[in-house]
Amino acid sequence: MTKSLFAVLVAAGVMRAGPCEGGGTTGLPDGLVTGTWGGENAGLIADDTSAHVHIACTYGWVHQAIDPGSAGRFDVPGEYLLRAYPVAVGPSMPARFQGSVRGFVMTLNVVVTDTTAGGDSTVTLGPVKLLFGLEPKMQMCPICRRTGERRAM
């Protein structure tokens, strides 16, 4: 079975199972977003204290747990680098990581305050759809795999 077909079957099973499986609306046993979440040219790798996000050739960090709560929605602060590949350029900028989790499907937006644009303007990345347990399918830009790599950036 190809990875694409497997991903479709997993997604169909998750959507059919709905919010009553696992930990309620989020489907997460402890209620927190943890583990690897992957999609097309996007990914999120999280533990109970932080998360690292890639959307295309950009990346950012959340320095706290992501807790979607009983409604399955989250909005947490972090930082983001808009020009990250092939060579990181510029400072990390303030960002909001906003989204929802339903079952094992996450919808994510990142709203970055671009402080380098000569006045604070915002750049919105997303929405991207991520599936729990699916490896991110990055195109030309690699994703950081280990916690040490994430923190060293």
What does each model-found stretch correspond to?
Residues 20-22, 60-72, 107, 111-153:
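Edge beta-strand at a domain terminus
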Residues 40-82:
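N-terminal glycine/threonine-rich, aromatic-flanked beta-hairpin/loop signature
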Residues 3, 13-31:
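Bacterial Sec-dependent N-terminal signal peptides
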Residues 24-45, 51, 76, 108, ...:
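Tryptophan-anchored aromatic micro-motifs
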Residues 103-105:
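Extracellular Ig-like/FN3 beta-sandwich strand-entry sites
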